């Protein structure tokens, strides 16, 4: 069975990590869709699609090693089309076929359900802590953000000078 899981992953954090780990134990293959792939260099979407692919790929490698599995994971950037009624068809045209969707996003749940897909809720993992908006705020404020993302993701953010980028685009003096 092949599953689909979508998010913006700005950045990929430990909440996403736990969902991916949980789903990988239930399915044969997983498609991870990177939503809003065209967005980058903004406060809400500071990282490029390519940077997010790298974050997710390295984090998934950690999961595979930890679980001792070698399942296929596709990581596919998906640009927004701004028409919800057509979004599921757009996704289906961009990714391999899948049997089930995992999401906690109410709109994603509804759109795939209406299109006839089996849709499963995922367990929420410390949603208040593992939330991209809050992690980006911590980055901006110089607070400890690294404990909320996998180690490999923190390394990538440092490699690309992601904190400086976020601070530069915020237009704030530090």
Swiss-Prot record:
GO biological process: NAD biosynthetic process
Reactions listed under catalytic activity: beta-nicotinamide D-ribonucleotide + ATP + H(+) = diphosphate + NAD(+)
Broad enzyme group: transferase
InterPro entries, per database record: Cyt_trans-like (IPR004821), NMN_Atrans_arc (IPR006418), Rossmann-like_a/b/a_fold (IPR014729)
UniProt keywords, alphabetically: ATP-binding, Cytoplasm, NAD, Nucleotide-binding, Nucleotidyltransferase, Pyridine nucleotide biosynthesis, Transferase
Keyword Nucleotide-binding: yes
Entry-linked Pfam families: CTP_transf_like (PF01467)
HAMAP family in alphabetical order: NMN_adenylyltr (MF_00243)
Protein name: Nicotinamide-nucleotide adenylyltransferase
